[in-house]
Amino acid sequence: MKPFPRAEISSSALQNNLAVLRQQASRSQVMAVVKANGYGHGLLNVANCLHTADGFGLARLEEALELRAGGVKARLLLLEGFFRSTDLPLLVAHDIDTVVHHESQIEMLEQATLSKPVTVWLKVDSGMHRLGVTPEQFAQVYARLTACDNVAKPIHLMTHFACADEPENHYTQVQMQTFNQLTADLPGFRTLANSAGALYWPKSQGDWIRPGIALYGVSPVTGDCGANHGLIPAMNLVSRLIAVRDHKAGQPVGYGCYWTAKQDTRLGVVAIGYGDGYPRNAPEGTPVWVNGRRVPIVGRVSMDMLTVDLGADATDLVGDEALLWGAALPVEEVAEHIGTIAYELVTKLTPRVAVCLA
């Protein structure tokens, strides 16, 4: 019997999305970003499905070690870099690249005793002002890393965009110019483009692109949909109806009696709630897909359940499946109703949701 709720992960969708991104950036290698448990899709699931990617980007060392333990041989890059000097021997032992973005990391590299050098991607703060060395610091930092025996040569170079998901925002062009002027004529790889860069800013594609959300079939741009780019949703979040009830006009439903029926109808109770990662703040009208149609959430989402208005003439039965988002109901649409972004929805599913390859 299939578990409920479950996140069905489509390997063919993941492979399609990688192919689409390769076509978009045909001169670039692809660093598939699989941080946050593969954006909620399962770290090893995604890496195995995307085994033809040229490398994988991760946030934490533990994620990289899990991939190595799972047999992944491709290039791995820690996008936040290492945090402790004791991380450095692990990077060497498991052949893991690291971003360097801060003085403390440079000092640890200079002071370490390592069996071989570490591959470093120096992050430039071209305008996001979160991580990275500033343009004023760049020459000095680059010289220090070049002089450090624990740093493999050449040093690779990267930056990250603040507003690439706003295609009309000129700031991305400013960031590209800043980065390109600083790094002109230096050896090594360059990477600028995230998903939005790969899809909307072709001049940013560089030697490597670093797509994340687009690999999972989701557009990074609010109001857009992955399908507009040939992307296919990789996750179907599925549960089922555990009750179908006749409901009279004037009767409330759920905690706080938040919603009251304006007419006689039939309600369905779906076995998923905020304990599974479905947002408690999903408002009335947020769509759920049941038997080929959108039906609205009514009342408050509770820990284990939510309620939908099936309509007065509904013939839905207990046990029928309900799709919370996926191929028939884009996660971008659900996120817009809730007032969040698709990234948050797919990454916040809890361990109660079974993640399985479909």
UniProtKB/Swiss-Prot annotation:
Any single Gene Ontology cellular-component annotation: cytosol
Similarity annotation: Belongs to the alanine racemase family.
Residue positions where N6-(pyridoxal phosphate)lysine is found in the record: K35
UniProt entry tagged with the keyword Electron transport: no
Function: Catalyzes the interconversion of L-alanine and D-alanine. May also act on other amino acids.
Database matches in HAMAP family: Ala_racemase
Protein name per the record: Alanine racemase
Protein's GO biological process: D-alanine biosynthetic process
Annotated disulfide bonds: none
InterPro entries associated with the record: Ala_racemase (IPR000821), Ala_racemase/Decarboxylase_C (IPR009006), Ala_racemase_C (IPR011079), Ala_racemase_N (IPR001608), Ala_racemase_pyridoxalP-BS (IPR020622), PLP-binding_barrel (IPR029066)
Enzyme Commission number(s) of this protein: 5.1.1.1
Alphabetical keyword list: Isomerase, Pyridoxal phosphate
Source superkingdom: Bacteria
Pathway of action: Amino-acid biosynthesis; D-alanine biosynthesis; D-alanine from L-alanine: step 1/1
